[in-house]
């Protein structure tokens, strides 16, 4: 067990880690009862050292850690980095970089969609991780030796996984495929949670400009309230209540209280008054200034095309050993079915080369799908036409 509890010890270990080409990083945190995640433990490892940092230790200053996270000479290796990076951003307004996310890399290398750390350790390192501390309350002190050992294991095996994935990416020429994902993960915009943008999580739940205006205001109010009180959004209002408010747009306390999902008694509280004020602001918005609502791509006769694109995506994913989610999602397929020039990742960069071009060819009948020996295969238009035109063998009369 190697547990860091003082600023001096943290500075010393970070200085040693900074001399290495990469460090593996993980965090343990709690967020079940708060809006902002509460950092409890940070795990760090280099090629020859692994430690856990007690982020809740009295008097501990995490500045040396944040300096290491910002060091451009050291690659920071995480698995499923997004929540870890969010915590660092919230605390220090920096994002660890350069960054390597082994979950993303594993998806490019054919290990499946969003493979867990435990499964990756099992597959790559042939080790089954101890899961006895999986549901630990990491805010409780003192930390037991078994808990610290469990936490450190999350960065020790990550070293071997990083090396193996790096080699595989270089061998296949796919190292550059990670650049878009890493750029997204290292963008501050990914972690900024501004109340004005809270409505975007529900953008497909309303269809009328008036409803959108109300949704933008009430979602923004909830976001600001949850942040200010540091409680989960659902503690303020559940998601379905926001949609009900947007669609019904009640304009009085009585009307608010009559909504089926609205919390009883809140309609005549301070929060109720603020919600009614938010609804009025939403109704007063000029429809011309509202974001454009995307029409439902699942309508308009594109359903069959989307289903074919799903088959094509699965075929390409399996044949190239790349997780389907890394190539395209259902929203991308719906967009491509509706518009050849859709602004989706699947029609840009390596994704376009691997999938997008063929998706458009399939959509316009220049590519066909068939089954050979139980597997879906692609046929170019000319090849498919020749097969269709090939005369059937004459039947031989019996007898």
UniProtKB/Swiss-Prot annotation:
Name of the protein: Ribonuclease D
Annotated EC: 3.1.13.5
Species for this entry: Methylocella silvestris (strain DSM 15510 / CIP 108128 / LMG 27833 / NCIMB 13906 / BL2)
UniProt keyword Ribosomal protein, yes or no: no
Localization annotation: Cytoplasm
Matches recorded under InterPro entries: 3'-5'_exonuclease_dom (IPR002562), HRDC-like_sf (IPR010997), HRDC_dom (IPR002121), HRDC_dom_sf (IPR044876), RNase_D (IPR006292), RNase_D-like (IPR051086), RNaseH-like_sf (IPR012337), RNaseH_sf (IPR036397)
CC cofactor: a divalent metal cation
Gene: rnd
UniProt function note: Exonuclease involved in the 3' processing of various precursor tRNAs. Initiates hydrolysis at the 3'-terminus of an RNA molecule and releases 5'-mononucleotides.
UniProt family annotation: Belongs to the RNase D family.
3'-5' exonuclease domain: residues covered: 4-170
Example of a GO cellular component annotation carried by this entry: cytoplasm
SMART domains on file: 35EXOc
Catalytic activity line of the entry: Exonucleolytic cleavage that removes extra residues from the 3'-terminus of tRNA to produce 5'-mononucleotides
């Amino acid at each position: 067990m190697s547990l860091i509890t003082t600023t001096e010890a943290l500075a010393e270990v970070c200085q040693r880690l900074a001399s290495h080409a990469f460090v593996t990083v993980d965090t343990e945190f709690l967020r079940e009862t708060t809006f902002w995640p509460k950092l409890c433990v940070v795990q760090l490892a280099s090629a020859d050292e692994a430690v856990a940092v007690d982020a809740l230790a009295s008097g501990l200053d995490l500045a040396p850690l944040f300096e290491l996270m910002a060091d451009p000479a050291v690659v920071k290796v995480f698995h499923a980095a997004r929540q870890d990076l969010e915590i660092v951003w919230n605390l220090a307004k920096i994002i660890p970089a350069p960054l390597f996310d082994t979950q993303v890399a594993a998806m490019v290398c054919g290990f499946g969609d969003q493979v867990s750390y435990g499964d990756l350790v099992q597959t790559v390192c042939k080790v089954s991780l101890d899961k006895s501390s999986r549901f630990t309350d990491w805010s409780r002190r003192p930390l037991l030796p078994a808990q610290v050992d469990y936490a450190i294991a999350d960065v020790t095996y990550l070293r071997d996984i990083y090396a193996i994935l790096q080699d595989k990416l270089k061998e296949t020429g796919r190292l550059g495929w990670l650049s878009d994902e890493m750029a997204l993960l290292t963008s501050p915009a990914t972690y900024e949670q501004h109340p004005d943008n809270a409505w975007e999580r529900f953008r497909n739940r309303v269809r009328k400009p008036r409803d959108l205006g109300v949704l933008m205001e009430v979602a923004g109010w909830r976001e600001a309230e949850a942040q200010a009180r540091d409680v989960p959004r659902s503690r303020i209002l559940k998601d379905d209540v926001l949609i009900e408010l947007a669609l019904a747009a009640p304009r009085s306390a009585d009307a608010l209280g009559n909504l089926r999902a609205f919390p009883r008694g809140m309609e005549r509280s301070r929060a109720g008054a603020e919600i009614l004020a938010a609804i009025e602001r939403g109704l007063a918005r000029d429809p011309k200034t509202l974001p454009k609502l995307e029409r439902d791509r699942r309508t308009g006769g594109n359903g069959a095309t989307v289903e074919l694109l799903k088959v094509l995506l699965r075929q390409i994913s399996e044949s190239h050993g790349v997780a389907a989610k890394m190539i395209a999602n259902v929203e991308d397929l719906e967009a491509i079915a509706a518009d050849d020039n859709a602004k989706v990742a699947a029609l840009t960069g390596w994704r376009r080369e691997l999938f997008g071009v063929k998706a458009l060819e399939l959509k316009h009948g220049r590519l066909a799908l068939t089954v050979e020996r139980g597997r879906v295969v692609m046929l170019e238009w000319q090849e498919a036409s020749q097969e269709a035109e090939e005369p059937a063998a004459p039947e031989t009369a019996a007898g």
